[in-house]
Every structure is written in C-alpha cells, then in structure tokens.
C-alpha cells in the first residue's frame, strides 16, 4: 500500500487545513523522511504490512505530476494507492473512504486523476469543516486549525489509522461500512 497525503510544501502551509493529508502522514511517522525529486517518502508497518507514505513536493494543484514517479519508485499499481486529502464539504470529525470517484472540486485530486487517466483511485477524504459565512474559500483552507479543532483532528487521525488497517486486512468495502458513518467529537 502507498498512502499519498496531499498538501502544499513549505512552512507557510505546514499546519493549514489544506495540508491535512501531510499532517496525517506526519501523525503516522514524523521523522526520517527521505526525498526524491518529486516527493518525500517514508515507510511504516501497519497490520503486519509495510506501507509507504508519500508527500508530493509539488504544490497541491500539481500533485498529479508526482504520481507516475511514485508508481515507478515503489513498483506500485493504481490498486496500491490511497490518496488522503481535505474536503471542505465534510464536517470536521468525519471522513469518507471511497474506491473511486470524481475530483469533487478538489484541485489536487483533479491533477492526480488527469495524470493517471482514471477516477478509479482509492481515497480518504478528511472533513475540515464548513467555512464561515462570508469568508473566502482560499483563506479558509489556507487557514490553520484552532486548538479545539486539533483535539478533534488528532482523534480523526487515530480513526484513519484504524481504517487503513481494516483496508489492509479486510478490504476497502469493510472500511467504508465501518468508518463512513462515524463522526469524531472532542
């Protein structure tokens, strides 16, 4: 399995809502990242399986540029990939696991679908909450989580780790049936 977390590189974006994919990977393993030309990577063991963690080093909207390199580097197929990214249409505390689908308006996922030529890409969408009325969407997704939101987000990351283990052991359908209806609260 190769878990690709989406985000923007650099300290300016490190803790923003849009970087929830990177933040989840750091939750799983926050040290000793190695760097290739188009991505940073690491490995962990989940449910007795070696799992690669990947952060594209392009900006979010160009995430797809890294994907052919990721597939080649890890000798992976499309079926091995799971993409993790933020979803402004989901409430903070909720995740959605899917086997395939459209980009849903997410430019990072749009870039990946275009680069790989298919929508048949497994993904975990992470709710980052509704933007406040009157606030610009860009300012919201590039804003940082509050202390209260971090409490929820860390619990969400624990649930996501469990979900990855279920995907590895029992398959994505089982994980979808368990986790898509859950809502994590503080």
Curated annotation (Swiss-Prot):
Q: Which reaction does it catalyse?
A: an N-acyl-L-alpha-aminoacyl-tRNA + H2O = an N-acyl-L-amino acid + a tRNA + H(+)
Q: Name one GO molecular function term.
A: peptidyl-tRNA hydrolase activity
EC numbers listed for it are 3.1.1.29
InterPro entries (UniProt xref): Pept_tRNA_hydro (IPR001328), Pept_tRNA_hydro_CS (IPR018171), Pept_tRNA_hydro_sf (IPR036416)
The site annotation (Stabilizes the basic form of H active site to accept a proton) covers 86
Which domain of life does this protein belong to?
Bacteria
Catalytic residues per the record? 18 (proton acceptor)
Summarize where tRNA binds, as residue positions.
Answer: 13, 59, 61, 107
Gene Ontology biological-process annotations:
protein quality control for misfolded or incompletely synthesized proteins; rescue of stalled ribosome
Q: Where is this site: Discriminates between blocked and unblocked aminoacyl-tRNA?
A: 8
Compartment annotation: Cytoplasm
Where the protein is mainly located, per its record? Answer: cytoplasm
* Subunit-level organization: Monomer.
Q: Which family does it belong to?
A: Belongs to the PTH family.
Name of the protein this chain belongs to:
Peptidyl-tRNA hydrolase
């Amino acid at each position: 399995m190769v878990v690709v977390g989406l985000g923007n590189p650099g300290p300016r974006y490190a803790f923003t809502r849009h970087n929830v994919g990177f933040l989840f990977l750091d939750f799983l393993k926050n040290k000793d990242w190695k760097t290739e030309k188009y991505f940073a990577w690491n490995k962990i063991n989940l449910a007795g399986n070696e799992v690669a963690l990947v952060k594209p080093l392009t900006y979010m909207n160009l995430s797809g540029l890294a994907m052919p390199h990721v597939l080649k580097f890890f000798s992976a197929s499309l079926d091995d990939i799971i993409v993790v990214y933020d979803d402004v249409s989901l409430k903070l505390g909720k995740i959605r696991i899917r086997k395939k689908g459209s980009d849903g308006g997410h430019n990072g996922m749009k870039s990946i679908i275009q680069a790989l030529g298919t929508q048949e890409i497994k993904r975990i969408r992470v709710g980052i909450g509704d933007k406040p009325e009157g606030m610009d969407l860009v300012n919201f997704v590039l804003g940082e989580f509050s202390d209260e939101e971090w409490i929820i987000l860390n619990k969400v990351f624990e649930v996501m780790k469990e979900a990855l283990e279920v995907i590895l052991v029992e398959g994505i359908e089982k994980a979808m049936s368990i986790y898509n209806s859950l809502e994590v609260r503080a």
